[in-house]
């Protein structure tokens, strides 16, 4: 399988690169020119297309011939349409029938049936306000990006990550269609396993046109409430943790 990873230089992106290589996939990574050095340890095993992920021409070149596209849908910048521009470029240029898997947070809702805890809603509101004020984060643009994905006729999945932490793989996260399901109550997933779920979704047609909300398979809520429908698997092989990125990481991608 030939796979393009959009946003390959970030923490989540590097884990996805590692998982994809472990599966024997041919990997093309997209990242900003100034971030190419973060992929140095993969330089002899992947192809890199440097450039902004919301640059349509960059994405067109990167996804050509790819069977699957993994996208870190980050809401960076205000007024830049970074998330929606990235999503639109992928929707426009991915090969017909390609499997498209996008990452975002729990705050995205596919059908409006999610039930969010008060604390979560307050946190999102504060982070969204501070992010816009500092002109570094635009959650509204990420909402617009996912609206376009949901409305498209492509083979998409939008994976909604919980709060993330570093650490060895615990295995494939469990998932639910809606926030409020008790299986998600622990609100914690290893970042390496978020990446594992993204890569696994490429070949899991049960997730077509779904927006699974995930949680770590060894969390208390998952152990108490998981079923055969949202399944568990053994931990992945050891994956090296990416070098530490910026200290301020509000959405932990």
Tell where the protein language model's regions lie, with residue ranges.
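Alpha-helical substrate-binding/gating segment
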Residues: 190-229
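Glycine/proline-rich active-site loop of Rossmann-fold NAD(P)-dependent oxidoreductases
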Residues: 110-114, 152, 166-175, 201-210
